Amino acid sequence: MSEPLAPGLDPGAAQPAIAGPAAAASPAATRAPIDLETYYTEAGMDYRAWSRGFNMHFGFWRAWMNPFALERMLERMSREVFARLALADGDRVLDLGCGVGAPARTLVAERRVTVTAVTKVEWQIAMARRLADGTHPLGSVEWLLGDYTALELPPASFQGAFSIEASCHAAGAAKEPFVREAARLLAPGARLVVADGFMKKARIPRWYSSMLGYMTRSWAVERFADLDAFTACLERHGLAVEAVEDVSYRIAPSVLHVPRVTLEFLLRELMLRRRWLNRARWGHVIACLIAPFVGLGRAWFGYYLVTARKRL
């Protein structure tokens, strides 16, 4: 859930313009996000309140699904991504930003594939291995500690790659370091599927920029990708864009669970366990409460599934 929602403002890239008087006053433009490892080390375990399976992303709803069954919608998001990869048995698949591995576990439980799941947060590897203990998957997972923009893996060695609410942690409006490495690692004809939030317009109101800025800083996101810049970057690196699907309304039922889950979490931590939250955890909680309001800014922001295929 990251994630997984703001133009977090890469100093080296073109910035979204803030509608209204030109001023450097926006907090989103002046404060850096929390460090990724710090965020997930201090607040990562709180995702347990969101998903018993540690699905660290929003869900995908279809008309036949119960909108009150949050975990099923979270798992459905993973399956929607996998369906777009069009995998075959024996394929090697790359999970770019795996968290504690819920999507990877879902994939290998159902398909005879080999997944290399990458995270730069060390404790997530240990947790992923513990959560996989006792399962009997059809496929297999290699848990890899590393930076998904600079992996020591051979080129053209994967038949598919996906990233669910993790590409947002890469730098820049186009997420070029992320795209470049994915393109290097994919075999010709292989697909990349990205599920994430994207900025739709360059100009945004100042009040909306403030909300977005708080969320990006609190969720260790420099900025969310600009949709047009991201798709152009894919093409530039030899990944032909096959589909850009706005699924914002598909994730809305899961987003509506956020206030309930957050308030239950606060009640449990503050009132029952009498634990005070550190700065990273408070930032995460407040950002979660802002999320439904950010999602209403449909003119400026959307949640997309982007599918691209490496040219032959």
What are these regions (language model features)?
Residues 149-161:
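A short acidic, Gly/Pro-enriched loop at the edge of an enzyme's catalytic core
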